[in-house]
Amino acid sequence: MKAGIIGAMEEEVTLLRDKIDNRQTLTIAGCEIYTGTLNGVDVALLKSGIGKVSAAMGATLLLEHCKPDVIINTGSAGGLAPSLKVGDIVVSDEVRYHDADVTAFGYEYGQMAGCPAAFKADEKLIAAAQETIEKLNLHAVRGLVVSGDAFINGSVNLAKIRHNFPQAIAVEMEATAIGHVCHNFGVPFVVVRAISDVADQQSHLSFEEFLAVAAKQSSLMVETLLTSLNRG
């Protein structure tokens, strides 16, 4: 099995990258892909850049050049579920765009034209992630992760997301684009991220302060998840 791992920022990939054995680097169109083995698993780790376009382009390059069997999206997210605190884990059941609106043509809010309303994460990967959470004794919430090209900082944008997606557990800027690409390629995916902020008026300050905490937690999750996947 080969696992593709995608993080947007340097801080979100550096801990994993530094542990890759026999590491080689491939740079294409501003995307950096690191290949080798991690915990005995063949991996291709992508630093995509921030936002939906960067994530979609990077995921496509990763799938075309490295042919991973599964995709794991890692990194940080803003918490929406009331029980989530900084460092907690979110696992996707599904992902949706929170900033897509073609409702004039009969689509659901958040649904891109010609696409499903949601992109479903793989059940086997979800189960492996939940097993990993139990093993590490982490607090986690499983559910809908929503994505858009905005860092959510303030009550107006937050209220809009809560109104349109009351079931959403977390918000970030890449996961749905990655799920969209994986859907088109027929490659299973899951989002496993750690909370860096709670998407409120002070979220930009919390993000800057706690990004390292989120990166450490999400990287630990991915490492342990790879071990679980390698066991089959």
From Swiss-Prot:
The keyword Transcription does not apply. It catalyses: S-adenosyl-L-homocysteine + H2O = S-(5-deoxy-D-ribos-5-yl)-L-homocysteine + adenine; S-methyl-5'-thioadenosine + H2O = 5-(methylsulfanyl)-D-ribose + adenine; 5'-deoxyadenosine + H2O = 5-deoxy-D-ribose + adenine. Pathway: Amino-acid biosynthesis; L-methionine biosynthesis via salvage pathway; S-methyl-5-thio-alpha-D-ribose 1-phosphate from S-methyl-5'-thioadenosine (hydrolase route): step 1/2. The keyword Hydrolase applies. Substrate binds at residues 78, 152, 173-174. GO terms for molecular function: adenosylhomocysteine nucleosidase activity; methylthioadenosine nucleosidase activity. The active site is at residues 12, 197. Transmembrane segments: none annotated. It comes from the Bacteria. SUPFAM superfamilies: Purine and uridine phosphorylases (SSF53167). CDD domains: MTAN. It holds the Pfam family PNP_UDP_1. GO terms for biological process: L-methionine salvage from methylthioadenosine; L-methionine salvage from S-adenosylmethionine; purine deoxyribonucleoside catabolic process. Its EC number is 3.2.2.9. Belongs to the PNP/UDP phosphorylase family. MtnN subfamily. Catalyzes the irreversible cleavage of the glycosidic bond in both 5'-methylthioadenosine (MTA) and S-adenosylhomocysteine (SAH/AdoHcy) to adenine and the corresponding thioribose, 5'-methylthioribose and S-ribosylhomocysteine, respectively. Also cleaves 5'-deoxyadenosine, a toxic by-product of radical S-adenosylmethionine (SAM) enzymes, into 5-deoxyribose and adenine. Thus, is required for in vivo function of the radical SAM enzymes biotin synthase and lipoic acid synthase, that are inhibited by 5'-deoxyadenosine accumulation. HAMAP family: Salvage_MtnN. This is 5'-methylthioadenosine/S-adenosylhomocysteine nucleosidase. It comes from Cronobacter sakazakii (strain ATCC BAA-894) (Enterobacter sakazakii). The lineage of its organism: Bacteria, Pseudomonadati, Pseudomonadota, Gammaproteobacteria, Enterobacterales.
